[in-house]
Amino acid sequence: MAMQKLFTYIYEFIKYRKMVLLEEKVPYDKFVQMVLNTGFFRINAETLNHGIVSVFIFGANGKYVHHGGDMRTLLTNTLNEKKHYEELILIVDKPVLSKKNILDIIVEQRAANPTIVINIYPYHLFCINIPKVSAIPRHKLITQEEAQEFLGREYLQPQDLMQISASDPPVVWLGGRPGDFVQIERPSETAMHAVVIRFITKSKI
C-alpha cells in the first residue's frame, strides 16, 4: 500500500514543486519491479533554475538501506555524472532513519558536495498530498526581500521569529531550505486568516 501511494504522490510532489520530468512516467508495475530488483527507483527532474533534482525511492529491504558501502557508491557515482545537480532526495522506510551507517554516509556526501542539497525523508511524507490536507494551514515561501520588509516593519531579527524545521512536511513539499522564510495562514476568529512568518532551520537529519 505504501508503494502504491508513493508512486502516486511522488509525481504530485514533483508537479507541486514546479519541476519538469526528464523521463516519461513509468507504469506502476515497472516501478515496483525496479524497486524489488535493483533496490531503488529513480526519477530525474529539472527545476525552474535548470538544476537537476534526482529522487530515489528505496525499497525497505534492499541492499542500499542496509549496507553503507553500497549507498556510498550509489551516491558517489550519481554525483560524478557531471550533471548540474541541485538536490538529491532520498526516500526510505522510516526505520532506516535510525541507521547510523546510512546517516553517516549522508553527512559524508553533504560535506563532499556542499553546493548540492542532499536530504533523506521517510515514506510517509510522500504518501499523501500535504498541500491538499485541509487540517494543515497554507504554507508559502516568501522572498528574502519580503521577509526583510516584514522584519523591518516589526523591528525584528530572524532569530526573533518562531522557527520551523526544514523537515516539516509542508516545508519539504515547498522545497524550503534553512535560512528561508515561510508564511503560514492560520484560521482566525477575528479575521479570515492570521498570517505568521516562520524562519526555516536545519533539520536534525
Swiss-Prot record:
GO molecular function: DNA binding; DNA-directed RNA polymerase activity
Cell compartment(s), UniProt: Host cytoplasm; Virion
Record bears the keyword Transcription: yes
Pfam families on file: RNA_pol_Rpb5_C
Alphabetic keyword roster: DNA-directed RNA polymerase, Host cytoplasm, Transcription, Viral transcription, Virion
Domain of life of the native organism: Viruses
Record GO biological process: transcription by RNA polymerase II; transcription elongation by RNA polymerase I; tRNA transcription by RNA polymerase III; viral transcription
Record carries keyword Oxidoreductase: no
GO cellular component, as recorded: DNA-directed RNA polymerase complex; host cell cytoplasm; virion component
Function of the protein: Component of the DNA-directed RNA polymerase (RNAP) that catalyzes the transcription in the cytoplasm of viral DNA into RNA using the four ribonucleoside triphosphates as substrates.
Assigned protein family: Belongs to the archaeal RpoH/eukaryotic RPB5 RNA polymerase subunit family.
Quaternary structure, from the entry: Part of the viral DNA-directed RNA polymerase that consists of 8 polII-like subunits (RPB1, RPB2, RPB3, RPB5, RPB6, RPB7, RPB9, RPB10), a capping enzyme and a termination factor.
The protein's name in its UniProt record: DNA-directed RNA polymerase RPB5 homolog
Species name: African swine fever virus (isolate Tick/South Africa/Pretoriuskop Pr4/1996) (ASFV)
